[in-house]
Amino acid sequence: MAKKSMIAKNEQRKEIVARYAERRAELKKIIKNPNTSDEDRIEAQFELNRQPRDASPVRVRNRDAADGRPRGYLRKFGLSRVRVREMAHRGELPGVRKSSW
C-alpha cells in the first residue's frame, strides 16, 4: 500500500494537469509552428516556463487503482501486476484465465 500522501499528491497533480491542459496545448502549438515569429515563440516559451511544474502531464504517475502501488502498473486493467494476478486467480477479471500451452 502506497502512502496516502503520495496518492493524494498524484490526484492533485491530475487536477492541475487538467486545469492547464488547454493553455499548454495552445502555447506548444505556437512554439512548434514554423510560421510563428521569434518574439512570439520566445514569449510563449517564457509563459510555458512560468506555469507550475505539476501542470506537465509527465509528472503524473500511473498508480494501481486499488492500493496506489506505483510500479508494475498494467494500463489495460488500471491495476498493478500483483493485484491483477490475485484477482485473476479469484476469477474476478472477466475473460482472463491462466495460460496453458
From Swiss-Prot:
GO terms for molecular function: rRNA binding; structural constituent of ribosome. GO terms for cellular component: small ribosomal subunit. GO terms for biological process: translation. Pfam families: Ribosomal_S14. InterPro entries: Ribosomal_uS14 (IPR001209), Ribosomal_uS14_bac/plastid (IPR023036). The keyword Iron does not apply. Gene3D superfamilies: 1.10.287.1480. It comes from the Bacteria. Transmembrane segments: none annotated. The keyword Manganese does not apply. Keywords: Ribonucleoprotein, Ribosomal protein, RNA-binding, rRNA-binding. Binds 16S rRNA, required for the assembly of 30S particles and may also be responsible for determining the conformation of the 16S rRNA at the A site. Belongs to the universal ribosomal protein uS14 family. Part of the 30S ribosomal subunit. Contacts proteins S3 and S10. This is Small ribosomal subunit protein uS14. It comes from Corynebacterium urealyticum (strain ATCC 43042 / DSM 7109). The gene is rpsN.
